[in-house]
Amino acid sequence: MGFDTFEEIIRYAIEREKEAVDFYEEASRLEPYAWAKETFEGFAKEEQKHAALLEGFLKGEKSGV
Protein backbone atom coordinates (compact mmCIF):
# COMPACT_ATOMS: atom_id res chain seq x y z
CA MET A 1 0.00 0.00 0.00
CA GLY A 2 1.44 3.31 -1.02
CA PHE A 3 0.49 6.84 -0.25
CA ASP A 4 1.27 9.88 -2.33
CA THR A 5 0.12 12.61 0.03
CA PHE A 6 -0.20 13.41 3.71
CA GLU A 7 -3.96 13.65 3.18
CA GLU A 8 -4.10 10.07 1.89
CA ILE A 9 -2.26 8.87 4.97
CA ILE A 10 -4.60 10.71 7.31
CA ARG A 11 -7.71 9.52 5.47
CA TYR A 12 -6.44 5.95 5.66
CA ALA A 13 -5.79 6.33 9.39
CA ILE A 14 -9.29 7.75 9.92
CA GLU A 15 -10.82 4.72 8.22
CA ARG A 16 -8.79 2.35 10.40
CA GLU A 17 -9.89 4.24 13.53
CA LYS A 18 -13.53 3.94 12.45
CA GLU A 19 -13.06 0.22 11.86
CA ALA A 20 -11.64 -0.06 15.36
CA VAL A 21 -14.68 1.76 16.76
CA ASP A 22 -16.97 -0.71 14.99
CA PHE A 23 -14.91 -3.64 16.26
CA TYR A 24 -15.00 -2.53 19.90
CA GLU A 25 -18.69 -1.62 19.76
CA GLU A 26 -19.49 -5.07 18.38
CA ALA A 27 -17.30 -6.71 21.02
CA SER A 28 -19.15 -4.72 23.67
CA ARG A 29 -22.54 -5.84 22.34
CA LEU A 30 -21.47 -9.49 22.40
CA GLU A 31 -19.73 -9.41 25.78
CA PRO A 32 -21.76 -10.91 28.63
CA TYR A 33 -19.57 -9.52 31.44
CA ALA A 34 -20.29 -5.94 32.46
CA TRP A 35 -16.66 -5.10 33.27
CA ALA A 36 -15.49 -6.28 29.85
CA LYS A 37 -18.41 -4.56 28.10
CA GLU A 38 -17.42 -1.28 29.77
CA THR A 39 -13.79 -1.81 28.78
CA PHE A 40 -14.72 -2.30 25.13
CA GLU A 41 -16.98 0.76 25.26
CA GLY A 42 -14.07 2.77 26.64
CA PHE A 43 -11.81 1.53 23.84
CA ALA A 44 -14.44 2.56 21.27
CA LYS A 45 -14.61 6.06 22.75
CA GLU A 46 -10.83 6.39 22.58
CA GLU A 47 -10.83 5.35 18.93
CA GLN A 48 -13.55 7.95 18.25
CA LYS A 49 -11.28 10.58 19.80
CA HIS A 50 -8.42 9.47 17.56
CA ALA A 51 -10.64 9.75 14.47
CA ALA A 52 -11.77 13.23 15.53
CA LEU A 53 -8.17 14.29 16.05
CA LEU A 54 -7.20 13.08 12.59
CA GLU A 55 -10.25 14.73 11.01
CA GLY A 56 -9.15 17.95 12.67
CA PHE A 57 -5.76 17.63 10.99
CA LEU A 58 -7.53 17.51 7.62
CA LYS A 59 -9.41 20.69 8.50
CA GLY A 60 -6.16 22.42 9.37
CA GLU A 61 -6.68 22.46 13.11
CA LYS A 62 -3.35 22.24 14.89
CA SER A 63 -4.66 20.30 17.88
CA GLY A 64 -7.11 18.29 15.80
CA VAL A 65 -9.91 18.83 18.29
Model-predicted regions and their roles:
Residues 1-65:
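Non-heme di-metal
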